[in-house]
């Protein structure tokens, strides 16, 4: 049996963890909204048309913030279309996903849904095809108390109190040629700066997220972030990162090593932010918003054919990845990587939340169930609050097709305000269990509380509506601090010690 060791000291920390690290994302795309979170004709719909079964699952994830309404969708979106009486809202073509948007679920509905889901709104504005005044007006509509045309219109539309939305995305993936109104870095940086400036003039308490490059494969990656920040540094608070991984070639070892790339991606963008900080002689630190991250590849070929040949419609089956057990391991490894970079990654949005590359799936007029990736996200959101500890990992290493010196075991650790310690660990070895020796220093008396394990002998095992519990955590005995414990082969582990 392989051996590994994890050394932790309560005085060696990375950073307090921003609670928004465990956010998610709802876009007007596919069935995320219509027949996802919103289905008025469903037998479990509430008085506003929100599916209660979906709300129950979302609450279990305990997501603190949900990004909305896009995504690529937002670059052609007119926010005013989504307010007022539903029967008067216009139907529009959504060029991003070649669908028809009825706007029967809009801004007020999402704010109400977020309250019922015990989450907050992270609202994205359109900087592709709209202008700076629109940015001002939507903040005024949402956050200004009363006494202006836009704030009084919100009141007329049924919301006396301001929505008080604190987090705002300045567009989406504006370097991408697929984006409606794509920009050069200079064009976008200037526009983002002016938009953020007037938005903060309306409400000085808000924070803004500038678009980073759409990915490391973009030809302007790095130079994009630098130029955008040179133009907008003083008025933005975060830079966005988007990252998806897949296993199209069925190389599980290489797939599970993908977080080596994620760690480098995070550190590269953080270094660019700090370089601009130095150039500008600024005392302000711009941090990171990893506001799209997940596994995404299962549905891509199907979606390509559907997108090319389908008629215009609403609530089409787009990006409906069915996740398997190895995908859950990778999601767990991504969460571990985010926790170990908690000093710079302050916001995270698992993309997305329902039906569209999502931990939660629904059937129209049918059931709702948790996909495999639901469980690592739920575990991290439940137990990963507090302070990220600096781990010393001693484990064997291996090479894969694209990565070298990949640790056989990866881990992150969190200490909450009560002094309880939670360890998240993944055994990357596909066939052999691993003994983990825990050396917990200066924590005082701790007693074993839980060892939860997500494991399946079949890496391709899936959860479905008819069999929703194929991949589900089990509880194993948790040894005392200092005693070794066993990580099953290919497993996600949550190990807790409490005061």
Where in this protein do the model-derived segments appear?
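Active-site His/acidic residue clusters
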Residues: 242-257
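Non-catalytic accessory regions flanking glycosidase/transglycosidase catalytic cores in CAZymes
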Residues: 1-224, 229-238, 262-263, 267-300, ...
């Amino acid at each position: 049996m392989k051996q590994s060791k994890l050394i932790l000291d309560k005085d060696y920390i990375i950073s307090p963890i921003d609670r928004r690290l465990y956010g998610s994302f709802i876009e007007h795309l596919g069935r995320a909204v219509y027949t996802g979170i919103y289905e008025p004709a469903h037998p479990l719909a509430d008085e506003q048309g929100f599916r209660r079964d979906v709300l129950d699952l979302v609450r279990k994830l305990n997501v603190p913030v949900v990004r909305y309404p896009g995504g690529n969708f937002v670059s052609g979106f007119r926010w005013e279309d989504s307010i007022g009486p539903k029967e008067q809202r216009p139907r529009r073509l959504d060029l991003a996903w070649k669908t028809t948007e009825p706007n029967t679920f809009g801004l007020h509905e999402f704010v109400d849904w977020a309250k019922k889901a015990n989450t907050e709104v992270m609202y994205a504005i359109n900087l592709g095809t709209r202008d700076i005044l629109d940015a001002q007006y939507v903040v005024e509509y949402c956050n200004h108390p009363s006494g202006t045309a836009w704030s009084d219109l919100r009141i007329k539309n049924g919301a006396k109190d301001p929505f008080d939305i604190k987090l705002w995305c300045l567009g989406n993936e504006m370097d991408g040629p697929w984006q409606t109104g794509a920009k050069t870095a200079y064009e976008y940086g200037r526009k983002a700066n002016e938009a953020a400036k007037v938005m903060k003039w309306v409400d000085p308490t808000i924070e803004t997220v500038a678009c980073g490059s759409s990915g490391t494969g973009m030809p302007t990656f790095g130079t994009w972030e630098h130029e955008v920040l040179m133009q907008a540094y003083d008025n933005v608070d975060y830079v966005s990162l988007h990252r998806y991984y897949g296993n199209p070639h069925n190389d599980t070892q290489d797939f599970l090593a993908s977080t080596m790339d994620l760690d480098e991606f995070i550190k590269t963008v953080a270094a660019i932010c700090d370089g601009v900080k130095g150039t500008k002689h600024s005392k302000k630190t711009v941090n990171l918003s990893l506001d799209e991250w997940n596994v995404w590849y299962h549905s891509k070929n199907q979606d390509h054919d559907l997108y090319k040949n389908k008629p215009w419609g609403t609530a089409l089956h787009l990006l409906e990845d069915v996740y398997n057990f190895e995908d859950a391991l990778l999601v767990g490894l991504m969460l571990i990587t985010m926790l170990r970079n908690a000093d710079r990654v302050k916001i995270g949005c698992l993309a997305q939340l329902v039906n569209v590359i999502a931990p939660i799936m629904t059937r129209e007029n049918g059931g709702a169930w948790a996909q495999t990736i639901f469980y690592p996200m739920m575990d991290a959101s439940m137990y990963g609050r507090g302070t990220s500890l600096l781990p010393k990992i001693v484990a064997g290493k291996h090479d894969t097709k694209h990565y070298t010196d990949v640790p056989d075991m990866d881990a992150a650790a969190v200490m909450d305000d009560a002094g309880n310690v939670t360890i998240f660990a993944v055994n990357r070895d596909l066939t052999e269990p691993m003994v983990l020796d825990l050396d917990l220093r200066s924590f005082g008396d701790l007693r074993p509380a839980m060892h939860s394990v997500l494991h399946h002998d079949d890496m391709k095992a899936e959860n479905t509506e008819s069999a929703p519990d194929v991949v589900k955590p089990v509880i194993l005995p948790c040894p005392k601090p200092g005693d070794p414990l066993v990580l099953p082969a290919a497993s996600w582990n949550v190990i807790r010690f409490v005061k």
